[in-house]
Amino acid sequence: MLIAITGTPGVGKTTIAKLLAEKLGYEYVNLRDFALEKGCGREVDGEVEVEIDELAYFVEKELKDRNVVLDGHLSHLMPVDLVVVLRAHPRIIGERLRERGYSKEKIGENVEAELVDAILIEAIDEHENVIEVDTTNKTPEEIVEEIIGLIKSGVKRRVGIVDWSEVYDEIIPYLRLGGE
C-alpha cells in the first residue's frame, strides 16, 4: 500500500510519516528527496520546484507496488492508495513556521491555506481515499495510532472533521503580520 502523508507546512508531516512507517513496517520516502534523486525537482532559493507529472511517473513506476509511506507537501498529487491529510490549528502552524524562520509572507500564506482547507480540497479533487486527521493537542503517537486504527477498520474516506472558521478572528494576526 502506498500512503501519502500531506498537509500544510508545519503540520508535522515528517514526524508522523516516519513514525507511521516504523509502526506499519513500511518504507519511508521523503518526496522532496525522491524528486531530486530522480531529476524531476530542482532547488531554487531553498525550495524545490518539481515537475508534478514527471514525479508522478516515477512514483507510479518505482513505489506503487511497495509498502511505502510517502512524506511531502505534494504527496496528495501523486498516484497513491490512500491520502492522509494532517490538520493543525492555524495558530500552531503560524508559531511553528515562525520558529523555522519563515518570512511573514510565507507564514500568512500557509496559515491561510490551513484556514481554508486548501490541501484537503486538493486531495479530495485527486483521490477517493482521503482521511483527514486533526493533530491539534495530540502527541505523534496518538496521531499515528488514530491513523492505524482508521486503516485497520477499513475507513477509506473521512473528511470534513475540521472547521477553523470559528477561530478566524484569532488567526488574523498571522494572516497580516506573520504572527506578530
UniProtKB/Swiss-Prot annotation:
Catalytic activity, EC: 2.7.4.3
Pfam families listed in its UniProt record: AAA_18
Root EC class: transferase
Reactions it catalyzes: AMP + ATP = 2 ADP; ATP + H2O = ADP + phosphate + H(+)
Region feature (LID): 99-109
GO biological process: ribosomal small subunit biogenesis; rRNA processing
Keyword Iron tagged: no
Membrane-spanning segments: none
HAMAP family: Adenylate_kinase_AK6
Subunit description: Interacts with uS11. Not a structural component of 40S pre-ribosomes, but transiently interacts with them by binding to uS11.
NCBIfam families named in the record: PRK03839.1 (NF003012)
Annotated PANTHER family: ADENYLATE KINASE ISOENZYME 6, POS9-ACTIVATING FACTOR FAP7-RELATED
Main function: Broad-specificity nucleoside monophosphate (NMP) kinase that catalyzes the reversible transfer of the terminal phosphate group between nucleoside triphosphates and monophosphates. Also has ATPase activity. Involved in the late maturation steps of the 30S ribosomal particles, specifically 16S rRNA maturation. While NMP activity is not required for ribosome maturation, ATPase activity is. Associates transiently with small ribosomal subunit protein uS11. ATP hydrolysis breaks the interaction with uS11.
Name listed for the protein in its UniProt record: Putative adenylate kinase
Organism: Pyrococcus abyssi (strain GE5 / Orsay)
